[in-house]
Amino acid sequence: MLVDSFNRVIDYIRVSVTKQCNFRCQYCMPATPLNFFDNEELLPLDNVLEFLKIAIDEGVKKIRITGGEPLLRKGLDEFIAKLHAYNKEVELVLSTNGFLLKKMAKDLKNAGLAQVNVSLDSLKSDRVLKISQKDALKNTLEGIEESLKVGLKLKLNTVVIKSVNDDEILELLEYAKNRHIQIRYIEFMENTHAKSLVKGLKEREILDLIAQKYQIIEAEKPKQGSSKIYTLENGYQFGIIAPHSDDFCQSCNRIRLASDGKICPCLYYQDAIDAKEAIINKDTKNIKRLLKQSVINKPEKNMWNDKNSETPTRAFYYTGG
C-alpha cells in the first residue's frame, strides 16, 4: 500500500502517454506549435506497462490514461489490453477530447477500458472552434454517442470560462442528463501556458446558475477523488471539480506519470522525480523506491486559492491535468 505523509492512501495513477494534442485549447496549450512532436522523449508503452504492473502490485487500483490527447498514441488499445489482462480488478479509464473516439471506442471497450471522460466545453460549433482552435464538435458528439453504443461508461468534463461558455451550463447539463451521463464542471486552473485573458467561474457561481432552474442537494463528497457530487431534485447527479476550495486536496489519492518518465506528486507544483532510466531498464527495485518516494513527496495541498502564490508553470498537456 502507498501512503503519503498526510496519511492519504495513494491508489490512483494518471499516466500521460503523449504530450501531443490535436486541439489548442485556450486554457491549456493555445500557443504551442501545431507541428510539436515529443516522440524522442516518449517512454515505450511496454516499459510503461511494466511500471504500472509494479504500481498495481504496490496497491494501485485505478489507472487513467491521459495526454495531451492519448488517442494519438499508436498501439494504445493493445497496451490497454495487456494492462487489463494483468489485473482485471484494476479500473482502467481514459480522458480524451473525443475527436478520434468514434472510430476507436469499440476497440477500447474490447481491450478492457471501463470508462472514457470526454471534454465538452460547448454545444455550439463556433465556440468549440474558438476554445479549441479546432472545428471539432461534430466529431466529439459522434464519439460520445459511439461510446454509449458500445457500452463504455462515460463522463463529461466542462471547463467553465467566463463570457465564453458560462451561459451554456444548463444546456450542457440537460444534454448530459438526457443521456444519463454525469457531467463535471471544472474550475479553470490558472497556469502560465493558458491565454492570459481566460477567467473561470468558481464553484459557487456555477451552482447559482444551475439553481436558477433546479433545486440542488449536495451529496457527500467521496472519500477519494476530486469531484464534489451534487444531486438534483429529480435524482440526477453532476459534479464540480473545485481546486480553489480549501478541502479540495484532503481526499487526493493520486500521482502522475508523465510521458517522459517523470513521476509528479501534484498537479500544481513543479516538483517531480525522474524515473525514466529505471523504467527503461525495467529496474523493479529502483522503480519501487522512486514510486514510494514520489508518494512521500506529495504536498498537503495546492496553492490555487492563495492569491499571493505564483502561477503554476507546468503545462497540463505534460501531466494530463
UniProtKB/Swiss-Prot annotation:
<feature type="binding site">
    <location>
        <position position="252"/>
    </location>
    <ligand>
        <name>[4Fe-4S] cluster 2</name>
    </ligand>
</feature>
<protein>
    <recommendedName>
        <fullName>GTP 3',8-cyclase</fullName>
        <ecNumber>4.1.99.22</ecNumber>
    </recommendedName>
</protein>
<dbReference type="InterPro" id="IPR013785">
    <property type="entry name" value="Aldolase_TIM"/>
</dbReference>
<keyword id="KW-0456">Lyase</keyword>
<dbReference type="GO" id="GO:0061799">
    <property type="term" value="F:cyclic pyranopterin monophosphate synthase activity"/>
</dbReference>
<keyword id="KW-0547">Nucleotide-binding</keyword>
<dbReference type="InterPro" id="IPR050105">
    <property type="entry name" value="MoCo_biosynth_MoaA/MoaC"/>
</dbReference>
<feature type="binding site">
    <location>
        <position position="249"/>
    </location>
    <ligand>
        <name>[4Fe-4S] cluster 2</name>
    </ligand>
</feature>
<feature type="binding site">
    <location>
        <position position="68"/>
    </location>
    <ligand>
        <name>S-adenosyl-L-methionine</name>
    </ligand>
</feature>
<dbReference type="GO" id="GO:0005525">
    <property type="term" value="F:GTP binding"/>
</dbReference>
<comment type="subunit">
    <text>Monomer and homodimer.</text>
</comment>
<dbReference type="GO" id="GO:1904047">
    <property type="term" value="F:S-adenosyl-L-methionine binding"/>
</dbReference>
<feature type="domain" description="Radical SAM core">
    <location>
        <begin position="5"/>
        <end position="233"/>
    </location>
</feature>
<dbReference type="Pfam" id="PF06463">
    <property type="entry name" value="Mob_synth_C"/>
</dbReference>
<feature type="binding site">
    <location>
        <position position="25"/>
    </location>
    <ligand>
        <name>[4Fe-4S] cluster 1</name>
    </ligand>
</feature>
<feature type="binding site">
    <location>
        <position position="155"/>
    </location>
    <ligand>
        <name>GTP</name>
    </ligand>
</feature>
<feature type="binding site">
    <location>
        <position position="95"/>
    </location>
    <ligand>
        <name>GTP</name>
    </ligand>
</feature>
<feature type="binding site">
    <location>
        <position position="14"/>
    </location>
    <ligand>
        <name>GTP</name>
    </ligand>
</feature>
<keyword id="KW-0411">Iron-sulfur</keyword>
<keyword id="KW-0501">Molybdenum cofactor biosynthesis</keyword>
<dbReference type="GO" id="GO:0061798">
    <property type="term" value="F:GTP 3',8'-cyclase activity"/>
</dbReference>
<dbReference type="Pfam" id="PF04055">
    <property type="entry name" value="Radical_SAM"/>
</dbReference>
<dbReference type="InterPro" id="IPR006638">
    <property type="entry name" value="Elp3/MiaA/NifB-like_rSAM"/>
</dbReference>
<feature type="binding site">
    <location>
        <position position="189"/>
    </location>
    <ligand>
        <name>S-adenosyl-L-methionine</name>
    </ligand>
</feature>
<dbReference type="InterPro" id="IPR010505">
    <property type="entry name" value="MoaA_twitch"/>
</dbReference>
<dbReference type="InterPro" id="IPR000385">
    <property type="entry name" value="MoaA_NifB_PqqE_Fe-S-bd_CS"/>
</dbReference>
<dbReference type="GO" id="GO:0046872">
    <property type="term" value="F:metal ion binding"/>
</dbReference>
<dbReference type="Pfam" id="PF13353">
    <property type="entry name" value="Fer4_12"/>
</dbReference>
<dbReference type="GO" id="GO:0051539">
    <property type="term" value="F:4 iron, 4 sulfur cluster binding"/>
</dbReference>
<feature type="binding site">
    <location>
        <position position="21"/>
    </location>
    <ligand>
        <name>[4Fe-4S] cluster 1</name>
    </ligand>
</feature>
<keyword id="KW-0479">Metal-binding</keyword>
<feature type="binding site">
    <location>
        <position position="266"/>
    </location>
    <ligand>
        <name>[4Fe-4S] cluster 2</name>
    </ligand>
</feature>
<dbReference type="InterPro" id="IPR013483">
    <property type="entry name" value="MoaA"/>
</dbReference>
<keyword id="KW-0342">GTP-binding</keyword>
<feature type="binding site">
    <location>
        <position position="119"/>
    </location>
    <ligand>
        <name>S-adenosyl-L-methionine</name>
    </ligand>
</feature>
<dbReference type="InterPro" id="IPR007197">
    <property type="entry name" value="rSAM"/>
</dbReference>
<dbReference type="GO" id="GO:0006777">
    <property type="term" value="P:Mo-molybdopterin cofactor biosynthetic process"/>
</dbReference>
<comment type="function">
    <text>Catalyzes the cyclization of GTP to (8S)-3',8-cyclo-7,8-dihydroguanosine 5'-triphosphate.</text>
</comment>
<keyword id="KW-0949">S-adenosyl-L-methionine</keyword>
<comment type="pathway">
    <text>Cofactor biosynthesis; molybdopterin biosynthesis.</text>
</comment>
<feature type="binding site">
    <location>
        <position position="64"/>
    </location>
    <ligand>
        <name>GTP</name>
    </ligand>
</feature>
<feature type="binding site">
    <location>
        <begin position="254"/>
        <end position="256"/>
    </location>
    <ligand>
        <name>GTP</name>
    </ligand>
</feature>
